[in-house]
Amino acid sequence: MKYGVLGTGMVGDALATKLAQLGHEVMMGGRSADHKNAQAWLAKVRGAKGTARIGTFADAAKFGETILNCTQGSATLEALKSVDAQDLAGKILIDVANPLDFSSGTMTLTIVNSDSLGESIQRAYPAAKVVKTLNTVNIQVMVNPVIVPGDHDLFICGEDAGAKQQVTALLREFGWRSIIDLGGIVNARATEQLMPIWMRLFTMFGSPLFNFKIVKT
């Protein structure tokens, strides 16, 4: 499978590295084709089972059969403007970002309550199959869930059932066992709005290596 990873930060690096290690073809895209972070990633994954290359956001979107949005959530929609909508049409777009704003000194969400980043992307690119997932865990947990002991859950939502099935299969490649399908993309609101409690727990624990577990009768 060919994956286009949009974003050269820590999230994009972690996911692109995991995909390459699993043997997939990966292109990391940034604002420029020669971004220093992308170049560092390319050097790091040399010798992985999969193939790796770098380019712009537009290059990665054109290359990938499945696209991962790993851009900073507050800047995602602006970043996606550089992508040709036709290069997203019919493709799965996995959105792992949260619309976070730290400019006031505390964390807030730039999109909240009656909307979400996941929904905003789906509206902007209606021909894409947006699937929201992995946005409720730290990057280390995203790609290596067993780092958190015991059973714990990952959420997924989106409009296209087939797309969610394909993303679920990828998540299982990552090692995820319990994946809860919340339904349509509107439920991205719920997962994005877990960020305040996630951040509070991170502050209390002094570590991001934790996750949520849903228990029912």
Regions found by a protein language model. Give the residues of each.
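NAD(P)+-binding Rossmann beta1-loop-alpha1 motif at the extreme N-terminus of oxidoreductases
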Residues: 1-44
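Rossmann-fold NAD(P)-dependent oxidoreductase module
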Residues: 14, 18, 124, 170
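Rossmann-like NAD(P)-binding element
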Residues: 46-92, 98-105
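General beta-strand structural signal in soluble alpha/beta enzymes
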Residues: 54, 129-135, 179-182
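Short beta->alpha connector loops
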Residues: 72-75, 136-138, 160-162
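Short, structured coil segments at secondary-structure junctions
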Residues: 89, 125-126, 174-175
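Rossmann-fold NAD(P)-binding glycine/threonine-rich loop
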Residues: 97-146
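Active-site-lining helix/loop region of Rossmann-like oxidoreductase modules
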Residues: 152-217
